[in-house]
């Protein structure tokens, strides 16, 4: 990018690493050699970034990590912008607490829960799992029957849900760690002759808050959707502006996120852009 007076001209050099860490590392090295002003990237996995981030630091290029975390020395990057995945997990469990209270669920009666996890070791998977478990363990009657990776895809969500339905005859709650897996789970549950959502056989908790899933919240097929806000560009722009002005920036920058049910979903569906 180049700076003209006080106006910033950002030329985006975009690289799609196709879900491969080695491609991301190669792209970052290429940006370092091009002497770009800033590098912004969303890491596919948490580990294995030390070397390339050290190279960026030595080249004096600020790195802004977005969306997912990196597990390395924080001094190797300038700032991180993204979701508080652990808080998202807690929000899901808090919603379930209230929902069970509303249904006058006997506190001694067992609540049978299955979990569709995302990609193994992804920040969203680790955080959402941890946050939900923190609150679940305070409820002795919440039993997590099974928790398996379904890789954030519809096809795998359906496959893992089919396996759960064959294995367990009594499932009360499905916690699905993203909307795509939820769509697969809905297909499997319907194929098994069961219903989900408001007044359904199975309570369905989803994450992401994409428009297509929020339509299903509106129609009562999904009970609740915990938002994962992807609109991080304005936060990143703000960080770059501050750095350009010589100001300090926070290391951790959480985006604002909400919990959507039938009660409040209409307020966002109108102008939802994702």
Predicted regions and their residues:
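Hydrophobic alpha-helical segments within soluble ligand-binding/sensing domains
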Residues: 24, 81-110, 127, 156-158, ...
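Short beta-strand elements at the ligand-binding edges of bilobed clamshell
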Residues: 14-16, 72-98, 147, 219-230
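Short, small-residue-biased leader/transition segments that mark boundaries at the very start
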Residues: 2-10
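Hinge/cleft segment of the Venus flytrap/periplasmic-binding protein
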Residues: 110-120, 124, 135-136, 228-274
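Exported/periplasmic ABC-transporter solute-binding proteins
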Residues: 187-230, 237-254
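Hydrophobic alpha-helical
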Residues: 29, 33, 37-58, 132, ...
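Flexible loop/hinge segments that line or gate small-molecule binding clefts
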Residues: 51-87, 106-112, 210-218
């Amino acid at each position: 990018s180049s700076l003209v007076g006080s106006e910033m001209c950002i030329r985006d050099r975009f690289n799609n690493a196709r879900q491969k860490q080695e491609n991301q590392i190669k792209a970052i090295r290429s940006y370092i050699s091009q002497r770009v002003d800033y590098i912004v990237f969303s890491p596919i996995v948490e580990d294995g970034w030390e070397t390339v981030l050290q190279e960026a630091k030595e080249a004096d290029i600020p790195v802004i990590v977005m969306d997912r975390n990196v597990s390395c020395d924080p001094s190797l990057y300038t700032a991180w912008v993204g979701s508080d995945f652990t808080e998202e997990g807690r929000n899901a469990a808090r919603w379930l607490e209230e929902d069970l209270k509303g249904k006058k669920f006997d506190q001694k009666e067992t609540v049978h829960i299955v979990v569709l996890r995302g990609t193994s070791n992804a920040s969203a998977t680790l955080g959402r799992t941890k946050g939900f478990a923190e609150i679940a363990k305070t409820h002795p009657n919440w039993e997590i029957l099974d928790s398996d990776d379904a890789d954030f895809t519809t096809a795998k969500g359906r496959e893992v849900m089919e396996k759960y339905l064959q294995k367990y005859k009594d499932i009360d709650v499905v916690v699905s760690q993203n909307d795509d897996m939820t769509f697969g789970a809905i297909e499997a549950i319907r194929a098994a002759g069961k219903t989900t959502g408001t007044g359904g056989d199975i309570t369905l908790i989803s994450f992401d808050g994409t428009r297509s899933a929020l339509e299903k919240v509106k129609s009562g097929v999904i009970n609740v959707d915990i938002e994962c806000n992807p609109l991080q560009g304005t936060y990143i722009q703000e960080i770059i502006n501050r750095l350009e002005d010589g100001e300090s920036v926070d290391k951790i920058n959480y985006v604002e996120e909400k919990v959507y049910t039938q009660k409040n979903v209409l307020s966002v569906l109108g102008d939802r852009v994702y």
